[in-house]
Amino acid sequence: MPIHLEIVTAERVVLSDDVDMINAPTKDGRVGILPRHAPLLTILEVGELDIVKDGVTTPFAISGGFMEVLPNRVTILADTAERADEIDEARAEAARRAAEQRIAERKSAQDLALAEAELRRALVQLKVAQLKKIRRERD
């Protein structure tokens, strides 16, 4: 018995499908969601969102948002959400370098916080893109 998942950003519906399991990065740590899970509303962190369907894990890079869990449905409202094959590694690497440079400059506390958030997002994108390469080489 699968659970219906919708991942939505301001720009688009990223995914609408029945899945077997969801593993999400929340403010309180990683949370695994299976069908008939207890209702839950939680804040999502920047991180890797793993979706399992038919024994295959598909990683997404998300940059925060909210997750509503009902017994047979999960809705994720994400700031951004990208599948591994949607990530431009060169762009993510450039964003990582730019964020590290801004952190080194330490212009203001606000700029530092924004640069750290950009760095976390770029690192997650790079990790998810690498996972796809590793899985492709393994298969």
Curated annotation (Swiss-Prot):
It holds the Pfam family ATP-synt_DE_N. It comes from the Bacteria. The keyword Transcription regulation does not apply. Keywords: ATP synthesis, Cell membrane, CF(1), Hydrogen ion transport, Ion transport, Membrane, Transport. SUPFAM superfamilies: Epsilon subunit of F1F0-ATP synthase C-terminal domain, Epsilon subunit of F1F0-ATP synthase N-terminal domain. It is a peripheral membrane protein. It is found in: Cell membrane. GO terms for molecular function: ATP binding; proton-transporting ATP synthase activity, rotational mechanism. InterPro entries: ATP_F1_dsu/esu_C_sf, ATP_synth_F1_dsu/esu, ATP_synth_F1_dsu/esu_N, ATP_synth_F1_esu_C, ATPsynth_dsu/esu_N. One of its GO terms (cellular component) is proton-transporting ATP synthase complex. PANTHER family: ATP SYNTHASE DELTA/EPSILON CHAIN, ATP SYNTHASE EPSILON CHAIN, CHLOROPLASTIC. Produces ATP from ADP in the presence of a proton gradient across the membrane. Belongs to the ATPase epsilon chain family. F-type ATPases have 2 components, CF(1) - the catalytic core - and CF(0) - the membrane proton channel. CF(1) has five subunits: alpha(3), beta(3), gamma(1), delta(1), epsilon(1). CF(0) has three main subunits: a, b and c. This is ATP synthase epsilon chain. It comes from Roseiflexus sp. (strain RS-1).
